[in-house]
């Protein structure tokens, strides 16, 4: 995980920061103006300062307008307010253009790909840790605060370096190291009864509006937000014209989605719009969609060498439909208030363009699969599943034709929908002033439109007087194997892989009871049955059935698979959770690190007394009923005994 605990001084960043005596502090790229990312950060910082100045002027003018009753003064103040509001609007539009700038985040390769949406880092002001920490050390711990000046200076240098992290693993390590130090500080110096009295000042990443709080959770949340934002910048600059680049980009966007989800689930009372629950949920969906897009781009690379293979084209059609579905969800989330009020309009338009573009690509690849090969006997059912709805509640479409002429007609219908979709994407592209400057986006959509038109011309005949058929929707599906589930397969649990274990049906059943979904749990084992003889135990999780991974299978899928087994039996592979290690014995507390892992976790103890205004805090979730507690299967209505 990117939020793991790291000792101070482990790993190095770039050496452009100010020099240190012992070299233990990792560094960012130092000056704001040494390179292109630094220039962008410097421009954002200047815009944030100007926005903050205009906001203060507007607040003062509004107070004067309410306080005076002089008509001439009120008219003059109203005129000045109109100027201030105009300046604020221009500054926010300029900041939005910076947020959608693709010049800095161009992929490193030469391939032409659709640009991604990177997220800018949150800016902050310099913070004086020395004075409040020295006072607290002297008053509470009874030690000389001046004897810790070196350590406090290292902390200040580390925070200063996190303002300009390098866009690589060193930058991520830098932010994670500072986050770990904040966890240590939270456990040692912050409590409901005492606090160093620091004021943390951060600017909103989307609007540039300043926010400040005295809660350390605000500082921790802002650093975690920057970890996710830095992952988006790393993913956006990958070269998606090669397999390695698409894999790195997909991984970076998935990690960004994980950071935003962790922040959303544990963060409350956000003082800035970019850290609100609605914004974080939208950002999580956006990163998932961009990761899915990278997966699709990776599949295009090997498939381009063999375009006449029908299974590859069908897979590409479903993957493109999956990307279109994800971007459709993102576009709806961006269009909902209050997100649409402060989100750059170009982001919403780009998500809409991508939804139309990838939906058109899905129909294009479906047409390629229909017209370039005749399906085998076993392949027809698979093609039917691609074009038919996956749920029984939706009406079934027409049966997939087998005759070449009928397949050509259906392919033309899909190409027609592809052409209409690409034309709609180009129309949406021209409506946005910011997107019109992105030449790569127009080039990619135009190339896709030309491919569809060329293929449609090949299928067009002079004697085509038949009634045009309506092409069915492509069922979205991704063939990417997910990792996890995290409820079991994470660093919180220790487990052991058992098997494969072969069992045969004895006296009508395999001798165990199943419960739960993803993964399915063995809730009970019949004494003396086949499962007990094979070594299966209560609490084991089934991860493989006859060599097929089933960690993400639903309960019904596993039961159906087991019931279909004949006299040959079944081969299962399970994982057994191991007991957690006993807590370490109580001993002298170290000065730098803490014994208890909870002390450097994500929670901040909430005060017992009520406050007049809610402050930003980390919520504690109720973790009961999770892994490790197995209720009696006889009282669980979801239990099913495998026959």
From Swiss-Prot:
Region ranges (Disordered): 1-43
Tissue: Highly expressed in testis.
Residue ranges with Basic and acidic residues bias: 15-25
InterPro entries to which the protein is assigned, alphabetical: BRO1_dom (IPR004328), BRO1_sf (IPR038499), HR1_rho-bd (IPR011072), HR1_rpt_sf (IPR036274), PDZ (IPR001478), PDZ_sf (IPR036034), Rhophilin-1_BRO1 (IPR042715), RHPN1_2 (IPR047138)
Domain BRO1 residues, every copy: 115-462
Domain of life: Eukaryota
UniProt xrefs under Pfam families: BRO1 (PF03097), HR1 (PF02185), PDZ (PF00595)
Keywords noted in UniProt: Coiled coil, Phosphoprotein
Annotated Gene Ontology cellular component terms: cell periphery; cytosol; plasma membrane
GO biological process: focal adhesion assembly; glomerular filtration; kidney development; negative regulation of stress fiber assembly; plasma membrane bounded cell projection morphogenesis; renal albumin absorption; signal transduction
SMART domains: BRO1 (SM01041), Hr1 (SM00742), PDZ (SM00228)
Biased composition annotated in UniProt, kind: Polar residues: 32-42
Domain spans labelled REM-1: 30-104
Similarity-based family: Belongs to the RHPN family.
Annotated function: Has no enzymatic activity. May serve as a target for Rho, and interact with some cytoskeletal component upon Rho binding or relay a Rho signal to other molecules.
Name of this protein: Rhophilin-1
Organism: Mus musculus (Mouse)
Organism placement in taxonomy: Eukaryota, Metazoa, Chordata, Craniata, Vertebrata
Gene behind the chain: Rhpn1
């Amino acid at each position: 995980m990117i939020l793991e605990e790291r000792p101070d001084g482990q790993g190095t960043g770039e050496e452009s920061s100010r020099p240190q005596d012992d070299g233990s502090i990792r560094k960012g790229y130092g000056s704001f103006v040494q390179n292109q990312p630094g220039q962008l950060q410097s421009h954002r910082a200047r815009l944030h300062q100007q926005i903050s100045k205009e906001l203060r002027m507007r607040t003062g003018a509004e107070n004067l307008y309410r306080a005076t009753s002089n008509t001439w003064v009120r008219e003059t103040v109203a005129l000045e307010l109109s100027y201030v509001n105009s300046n604020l609007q221009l500054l926010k539009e300029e900041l939005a253009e910076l947020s959608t700038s693709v010049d800095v985040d161009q992929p490193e390769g030469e391939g032409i790909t659709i640009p991604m949406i990177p997220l800018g880092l949150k800016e902050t002001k310099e913070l004086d840790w020395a004075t409040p920490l020295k006072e607290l050390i002297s008053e509470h711990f009874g030690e000389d605060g001046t004897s810790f000046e070196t350590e406090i200076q290292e902390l200040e240098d580390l925070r200063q370096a996190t303002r300009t992290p390098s866009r690589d693993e060193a930058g991520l390590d830098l932010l994670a190291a500072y986050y770990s130090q904040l966890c240590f500080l939270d456990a040692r110096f912050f409590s409901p009864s005492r606090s160093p009295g620091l004021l943390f000042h951060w600017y909103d990443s989307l609007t540039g509006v300043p926010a400040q709080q005295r809660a350390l959770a605000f500082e921790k949340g802002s650093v975690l937000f920057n970890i996710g934002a830095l992952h988006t910048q790393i993913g956006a600059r990958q070269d998606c014209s090669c397999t390695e680049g698409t894999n790195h980009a997909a991984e970076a966007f998935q990690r960004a989605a994980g950071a935003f989800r962790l922040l959303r689930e544990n963060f409350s009372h956000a003082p800035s719009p970019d850290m609100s629950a609605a914004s974080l949920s939208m950002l999580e969906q956006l990163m998932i969609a961009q990761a899915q897009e990278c997966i699709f781009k990776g599949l295009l690379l090997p498939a381009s060498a063999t375009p006449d293979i029908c299974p590859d084209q069908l897979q590409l059609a479903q993957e493109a439909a999956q990307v279109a579905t994800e971007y459709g969800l993102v576009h709806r989330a961006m269009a909902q208030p209050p997100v649409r009020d402060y989100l750059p309009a170009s982001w919403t338009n780009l998500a809409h363009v991508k939804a139309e573009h990838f939906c058109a690509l899905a129909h294009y690849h479906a047409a390629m699969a229909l017209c370039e090969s005749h399906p085998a006997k076993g392949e027809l059912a698979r093609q039917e599943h691609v074009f038919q709805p996956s749920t029984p509640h939706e009406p079934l479409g027409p049966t997939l034709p087998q005759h070449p002429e009928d397949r050509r007609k259906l392919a033309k219908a899909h190409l027609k929908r592809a052409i209409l979709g690409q034309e709609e994407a180009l129309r949406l592209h021209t409506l946005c002033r910011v997107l019109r400057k992105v030449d790569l986006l127009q080039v990619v959509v135009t190339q896709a439109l030309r491919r569809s038109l060329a293929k449609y011309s090949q299928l067009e005949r002079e004697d085509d007087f038949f009634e045009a058929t309506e092409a069915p929707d492509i069922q979205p599906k991704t063939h990417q194997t997910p990792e996890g589930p995290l409820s079991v397969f994470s660093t919180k649990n220790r487990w052991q892989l058992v098997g494969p274990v072969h069992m045969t049906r004895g006296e009508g059943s395999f001798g165990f009871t199943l419960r739960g979904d993803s993964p399915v749990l063995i809730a009970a084992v019949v004494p003396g049955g086949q499962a007990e003889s094979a070594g299966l135990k209560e609490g084991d999780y089934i991860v493989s059935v006859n060599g097929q991974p089933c960690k993400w299978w639903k309960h019904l899928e596993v039961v159906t698979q087991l019931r279909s087994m004949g006299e040959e039996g079944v081969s299962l592979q399970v994982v057994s959770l191991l007991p957690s290690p006993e807590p370490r014995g109580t001993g002298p507390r170290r000065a730098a690190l803490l014994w208890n892992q909870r002390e450097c976790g994500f929670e901040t103890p909430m005060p017992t007394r009520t406050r007049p205004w809610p402050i930003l805090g980390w919520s504690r979730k109720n973790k009961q009923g999770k892994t490790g507690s197995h209720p009696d299967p006889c009282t669980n209505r979801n239990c099913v005994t495998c026959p």
